[in-house]
From Swiss-Prot:
Role according to the record: Involved in the import of nuclear-targeted proteins into the nucleus and the export of poly(A) RNA out of the nucleus. Has a role in the endoplasmic reticulum-associated degradation (ERAD) pathway.
Cell compartment(s), UniProt: Cytoplasm, Perinuclear region; Endoplasmic reticulum membrane; Nucleus membrane
GO cellular component, one term: nucleus
One Gene Ontology term from the biological process aspect of the record: mRNA transport
Name of protein: Nuclear protein localization protein 4
Entries under Gene3D superfamilies matching the protein: Cytidine Deaminase, domain 2 (3.40.140.10), Phosphatidylinositol 3-kinase Catalytic Subunit, Chain A, domain 1 (3.10.20.90)
Presence of keyword tRNA processing: no
Native source species: Neurospora crassa (strain ATCC 24698 / 74-OR23-1A / CBS 708.71 / DSM 1257 / FGSC 987)
Region (Disordered): 621-660
Transmembrane feature ranges: none
Amino acid sequence: MLLRVRGPDGMLRLTLEKDDTFADLGRQLIPKLPPTVDPKTITFSNHPTGSDAKNLSEVAKFKVGQTGLSHGDLIFVTYKHNDAATDGPGNGEATKSSVLSSTNRLNGKPILPAEDLPIDPPPLTSPHEHIKNPWETVRQSPLDDRLDKRDGKIPRGRDHKMCRHGPKGMCDYCMPLDPFNAKYLEEKKIKYMSVHAYLRKINSATNKPELGASFIPPLVEPYYRVKRDCPSGHPQWPEGICTKCQPSAITLQPQPFRMVDHVEFATPQIIDKFLNPWRMTGCQRLGILYGKYLEYDVVPLGVKAVVEAIYEPPQVDEIDGVTLNAWENEKDVNEVARLCGLEPVGVIWTDLLDAGKGDGSAICKRHSDSYFLAAQEICFAARLQAQHPKPTKWSDTGRFGSNFVTCVISGNEQGEISISAYQMSNDAVEMVRADIIEPSTDPGQMLVREEEEDDGSVSRTRYIPEVFYRKINEYGANVQENAKPAFPVEYLFVTLTHGFPESPRPVFTNDGFPIANREFVGEAQEASSVAKILKVNQKSDQFDVSNFHLLCFIRQMSVLSKDEEALLCRVATQHDLADAFQLRATEGWRTLHMILESTGERLPKRPRTEDASFPSVDRSYLSHHPLMQRNHNSTDEPLAKRFAAVRLNEQRPPPPPPPE
């Protein structure tokens, strides 16, 4: 049914079902309101005066049909605007109200006031705020600080054909190359330069220390939204707009650099265990990659993401996709990762379809004639990257891009299961932030949104600038094309390399604990599993807690203190015997042992021999009985059921032989 919603900023029309709740109504309403609206102040009423107004959080669980609303009814909405919206992306600080009013879920739906944020990101629709002297106030990662101190020059040996100088001399043929040298990258078949090499390239053109000019941050993030607080003095958007506050036309080009150059999985077992649910059910699976960033020497000034664990959040797996549920313990998992020296580095999901040959091969769906990354997947990954910005002192906003990576497991052209790694470009992330693009039914095409709503009214929440892209036409000329209504998705992502180490040295060495949220395949995390890992009933001094999922489960038990949890994570990652003995002597660890001893460890089932199963019954008769034929191969069936079958057989005389 169609509901009309009248508010201070005009009339809106929403399409709902009677079984939909007011929470669903709020998810449709909030994106259509001005971005400065505080969702906590939204109220609904049947009267224009608002005498019986109810807050959205109070009626979020009620169905629309329960209130007597029908097709075409009019409801009145009131709300308040935030006094000031702060961006703060450089230092990672944001007020709670601004985050609530501007953050969407991973699937694009707005977050209601009564719901918790999955993580605490900077606002996605906040104004673009510049930071004064970011090189003094912004705290980078230790890896970026180390790479900033390196010159990144590529050494070359003496050319015996061209060099005419002595062994201690140097000329143009043997002098070190810059890390962004195009010829060197082409020879080494490096498609994209690293972000630190790109920084060296643009910094050499932006700042000239020899001229004595003031320093200008060379990195600039794209900004495709209407700027707030325009100095021209006109009313704020959407009441007014001018050339100073409106975004310029967008010209898309392939991004020449990438924030992360390589994705390294600590062991092949990480991927193998992640694929087990698909092998058992044929449904897809999604997981969050936890690891760390290290230097990557294959690419000049390169960075690689080392994956140590995959955590699978609550989800509903289907054959053609995944539906994410609320991840209630995300903060606990991130805290365990932090204590282990890890952080979320990416996301991974499967897109597999069994070839039906019985050899484990998969159908190749992603290739040059179809697509490599679908438009819907690009928008999903771009939102994740927007929630994990990278702080840097080389940008005037204190941030630039994101190190968050995206991995897809699918079948290749040889029918093998392979991994592909990607990152969304900075233009793609900002276009998703600004609500300029949306997925299309064609996975290889991205749509440019229209400013008009479905009812023909002009949108009050987004401004769509002109979008173009450059390509090589059939005559070999570099031409500019209009991106409306759709353009190829290849302009929105870059590819990464991936692999496994030659000598694996994983942080977590024990893979015997069940993985969370796998109850649908019969893999559940229980206290008995912890008792088995810790060998509680065996009274052993040796125990192996080096498992990420085990650490997360122990934290959920809320037995250990913060210091004891930090010590436990240190034992799991550093494998120090001194720390292990110190952990065993703590009060929390002894309490955990007492709980596990009271819970108990399940004893293994007693094996049975076939000779002792039916000592006094004719086996030739039992072998022809349909019940025994069905249970003949089930050796782990309880003995009581098998003897019950024997008693039933003894009460029934054998059938007479057929007449000859």
